[in-house]
Design a protein with these regions (language model features):
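Single conserved hydrophobic/aromatic residue that forms the stacking wall/gate
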Residues: 136-153
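An acidic/histidine-cluster motif and surrounding catalytic segment
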Residues: 1-95, 99-138
Length: 153
C-alpha cells in the first residue's frame, strides 16, 4: 500500500506517451499507475521521428535546431493533446512513459493544493522536476497584461 497515493487524488486523466517498440516502458508506467492508485490513464502511441514518416503532420522542413527525435517527441505531445480535445474533460495530464511519481512521496502538498493555486482560466500548466532537492509549491504569477480575467473597474 502506498501511503502517499492520496497526494495525487484529483489528478486529471493521464495521457501517457509510449513508443510501440518499447512495451517494457509501458509496463513500467502501468505498474507505477497501479502503485499510485491512478486509474484514469490512456496510452498514446508515440511518433518515432527517427523512423516514422511525419510528412503528413509536419509541413516543410524540420526546424534547424531540432533533430528528428525531438520532432517525434513534439508531434507525440500534440497527438496526446488532440486525443484529449476529443473528450469533455476540462484538463489533462500529459506525460511520457519515463515519468516517475516517486518524488510525490516527499511533497508537503497535494495535487489539489497545486490546482487551487492555478488561475481558473489557465491554458497550459507545465509540471517538471529539474532539481528534486528543491520543490516550489507556488506557480509563477501570470503576467497581468495577458490575463483574461475581467478587470474590476
Amino acid at each position: 500500500m502506498n501511503k502517499a497515493a492520496y497526494k495525487l487524488k484529483g489528478l486529471p486523466p493521464i495521457y501517457c506517451i509510449n513508443l510501440d517498440g518499447e512495451p517494457h516502458r509501458w509496463e513500467a508506467a502501468e505498474n507505477m499507475f497501479k502503485e499510485w492508485e491512478v486509474e484514469n490513464y490512456t496510452r498514446v502511441s508515440a511518433y518515432d521521428g527517427r523512423e516514422d514518416d511525419l510528412s503528413d503532420i509536419i509541413k516543410g522542413k524540420y526546424p534547424d535546431n531540432m533533430n528528428s527525435g525531438e520532432v517525434g517527441c513534439v508531434t507525440s505531445h500534440l497527438k496526446a493533446m488532440k486525443e484529449f480535445l476529443k473528450t469533455d474533460e476540462p484538463y489533462a495530464f500529459i506525460i511520457e512513459d519515463d515519468c516517475d511519481f516517486d518524488p510525490v512521496r516527499y511533497w508537503s502538498f497535494t495535487w489539489r493544493d497545486i490546482m487551487s493555486k492555478i488561475p481558473y482560466d489557465f491554458d497550459v500548466f507545465q509540471t517538471a522536476i529539474i532539481n528534486p532537492c528543491l520543490l516550489y509549491t507556488s506557480p509563477s504569477p501570470r503576467d497581468k497584461s495577458s490575463s483574461r480575467m475581467p478587470s474590476s473597474a
